[in-house]
Protein backbone atom coordinates (compact mmCIF):
# COMPACT_ATOMS: atom_id res chain seq x y z
CA UNK A 1 0.00 0.00 0.00
CA UNK A 2 1.21 3.50 -0.78
CA UNK A 3 0.84 5.64 2.35
CA UNK A 4 0.76 9.42 1.91
CA UNK A 5 1.41 12.13 4.48
CA UNK A 6 0.39 15.64 3.42
CA UNK A 7 1.37 18.69 5.44
CA UNK A 8 -1.35 19.73 7.88
CA UNK A 9 -3.12 22.90 6.75
CA UNK A 10 -5.73 23.35 9.45
CA UNK A 11 -5.17 26.59 11.40
CA UNK A 12 -2.80 26.23 14.35
CA UNK A 13 -1.96 22.59 13.59
CA UNK A 14 1.79 22.07 13.42
CA UNK A 15 2.08 18.34 14.08
CA UNK A 16 2.66 15.65 11.50
CA UNK A 17 0.83 12.33 11.26
CA UNK A 18 3.88 10.06 11.36
CA UNK A 19 7.46 10.18 12.59
CA UNK A 20 10.45 8.74 10.76
CA UNK A 21 10.30 5.74 13.13
CA UNK A 22 6.74 5.11 11.96
CA UNK A 23 7.91 5.28 8.36
CA UNK A 24 10.49 2.58 9.11
CA UNK A 25 7.78 0.33 10.57
CA UNK A 26 5.47 0.79 7.59
CA UNK A 27 8.27 0.00 5.15
CA UNK A 28 9.29 -3.06 7.18
CA UNK A 29 5.74 -4.29 6.72
CA UNK A 30 5.82 -3.92 2.95
CA UNK A 31 4.36 -0.46 2.45
CA UNK A 32 5.77 2.57 0.63
CA UNK A 33 5.57 6.05 2.15
CA UNK A 34 5.38 9.45 0.46
CA UNK A 35 5.59 12.65 2.50
CA UNK A 36 4.87 16.20 1.37
CA UNK A 37 7.89 18.50 1.43
CA UNK A 38 8.19 20.23 4.83
CA UNK A 39 5.31 18.21 6.33
CA UNK A 40 7.32 17.63 9.50
CA UNK A 41 8.79 21.09 9.91
CA UNK A 42 6.30 22.11 12.63
CA UNK A 43 7.33 19.03 14.60
CA UNK A 44 11.06 19.65 14.06
CA UNK A 45 11.35 16.74 11.61
CA UNK A 46 13.29 17.47 8.43
CA UNK A 47 12.70 16.05 4.99
CA UNK A 48 16.12 14.41 5.17
CA UNK A 49 15.05 12.49 8.30
CA UNK A 50 12.07 11.11 6.41
CA UNK A 51 14.27 10.25 3.43
CA UNK A 52 16.76 8.43 5.68
CA UNK A 53 13.82 6.42 7.02
CA UNK A 54 12.89 5.36 3.49
CA UNK A 55 10.13 7.82 2.60
CA UNK A 56 10.03 9.64 -0.70
CA UNK A 57 9.49 13.41 -0.48
CA UNK A 58 7.02 14.95 -2.93
CA UNK A 59 6.66 18.66 -3.62
CA UNK A 60 2.93 19.20 -3.17
CA UNK A 61 -0.09 17.93 -1.31
CA UNK A 62 -1.82 17.43 -4.66
CA UNK A 63 0.82 14.82 -5.57
CA UNK A 64 0.28 13.03 -2.25
CA UNK A 65 -3.51 12.97 -2.59
CA UNK A 66 -3.32 11.85 -6.25
CA UNK A 67 -1.01 8.90 -5.58
CA UNK A 68 -1.60 7.55 -2.07
CA UNK A 69 -3.89 4.63 -1.27
CA UNK A 70 -3.98 5.71 2.38
CA UNK A 71 -3.76 9.31 3.62
CA UNK A 72 -2.49 9.90 7.16
CA UNK A 73 -3.34 13.22 8.83
CA UNK A 74 -3.36 14.54 12.37
CA UNK A 75 -6.63 16.43 11.93
CA UNK A 76 -9.62 15.75 9.73
CA UNK A 77 -9.49 17.00 6.15
CA UNK A 78 -10.81 20.51 5.64
CA UNK A 79 -13.05 21.75 2.81
CA UNK A 80 -10.23 22.60 0.38
CA UNK A 81 -9.01 19.00 0.64
CA UNK A 82 -12.37 17.34 -0.13
CA UNK A 83 -11.99 17.57 -3.94
CA UNK A 84 -8.60 15.85 -3.67
CA UNK A 85 -10.10 12.69 -2.17
CA UNK A 86 -10.52 9.77 -4.54
CA UNK A 87 -13.04 6.95 -4.54
CA UNK A 88 -11.53 3.97 -2.70
CA UNK A 89 -8.87 6.07 -1.00
CA UNK A 90 -8.57 5.52 2.74
CA UNK A 91 -8.12 8.41 5.17
CA UNK A 92 -6.95 8.19 8.77
CA UNK A 93 -6.94 11.18 11.10
CA UNK A 94 -7.40 11.93 14.77
CA UNK A 95 -10.62 13.92 15.12
Predicted regions and their residues:
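Histidine-anchored nucleotide/phosphate-binding helix
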Residues: 16-27
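Conserved small/polar residues in nucleotide/adenosyl-binding loops
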Residues: 93-95
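Conserved acidic residues
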Residues: 69, 89
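Short internal beta-strands
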Residues: 4, 25-42
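Short, conserved loop/helix-junction motifs that constitute active-site signature segments
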Residues: 83-88
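Short acidic low-complexity segments
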Residues: 54-67
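N-terminal beta-loop-helix "entrance" segment that forms/cooperates
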Residues: 34-57
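Short, glycine-rich nucleotide/cofactor-binding loops
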Residues: 6-17
